[in-house]
């Protein structure tokens, strides 16, 4: 039996909710409501809150970012970008009968959104807006929502005992694109009070949120230990007067619910990465949350984040067995003295150093590797083939390489001029406790690889990957629920291990098609291009070192205030040098062709997923002004992380630009592509 399009079970639940609404609706005369974290349930998987929308806007406008947006030379681009953002936003908000413009007119206080999994595998979206002082605008918005829903052929549902504040619409069923899939049931509900508006795609959740606006609920998000730990740690770092953005997510919980609520339009073969992470112990990460503020304490932007991942019961919080299975690789011991090495060039765009227990990571990766490939024993097979295959390097990877590495991993980033699709450069430097052994292992491995050629860079022996293809490299990126094909299985094929290694190598070549490798300065150096490796090896240190740069020193001093003791990560970046490659590619309309790691990731996320295709650029950058005219708006950034009993605490800041002159990006001495 159905009642106006709603089944009896759902109607009974709604009636129960509405009964509580009738009792609790009298609160509305009193005005504002408790913080949204006391309104939304403990089953909230993701949450975003802006307690002071006006204050946030004012603070943003005072930052260099706000000044950039207001720069007259940026007007054409900003207007076009806002139009596009509005269109993209409408595709999502339209499901609730809203637009981005709507959200800018009605808030008088907090605006919060939540993704709620009240029923396993069903993700609901609820938006809560404090409309204090904007009651007329809120009423007009509700009328517009109703008009838009009716234009989409929605039907208003009438349920007995429902208070007049809540309205429910049933939308026509929507096919998800699969011929064998049933049409999706869609509803929109909204409730309006004198000082609040609640909108969502689940009438029960909207009704419950509205019903508890007076006092909050006992089973609220604040009863989630991960939420209270993360927001408790980070919230005390930035006062409410700074108009912060607050956020929280249960990463695996959200991913699983999103996956179940949004099945792929096409059936995909291969591993389910969300399920794999859960199986491999990464569900030890219970939640991630933090706060972000603009124009606070002399910083253009300030952020604090806690990854809540306490040790499993009975485990040592800082030991290698803190977690199970592959999650044991998440071991980042704190240390003192993290700073740029003398050989890090002064003009770099960015530097990041991470303390990582690589030995534990290596011994933990086996089960994850096998799970992703889809065949138990594959990792051991690959390791054995490296040692025993007569055509291979015949090395013991654990003994000859991993055991000779330290715990410091450093990333250097920069770019070369003129800016093109292959301008960005990176160097990954891994500390070597026994450089001679690492160098010998690298030489033996490279000599057995026909795709690597030996080169000489000054007094250093290095190896460079021979680029045999001009094809645009791509990274396969999967959204939650997505998958890539498993490695082919060749039952009875003696060459199966070789085939697996070859496939892995092909992926490496796509990622870094011009890579060069050497051992120098007590590190294994892996460079994206030969020219950046040459620059690092030739750097004399001293005044030419990043550590000697004035902007690094001032930014490092700010980071030291955030992390005065030991840390597992320290990072420095120059916003202008970091942003410039992407900025110029946007101006050229060439971002989809970018060969940088970031560009490939972006293209993988935004592309159609079909191999060999180049996505259409989503943002029109043709109206952007010359970069030099806006460089002054970009300053420096810093980031730190420390390992705690609760997980990992991170904090960082963006500093306004000083009077420093930009470090000049060095043009490659070799032809493009090196």
Residue positions per predicted region:
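Hydrophobic, ordered structural segments
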Residues: 55, 186, 191-196, 200-219, ...
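Long compositionally biased, domain-poor regions of proteins
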Residues: 107-110, 168, 289-294, 392-421, ...
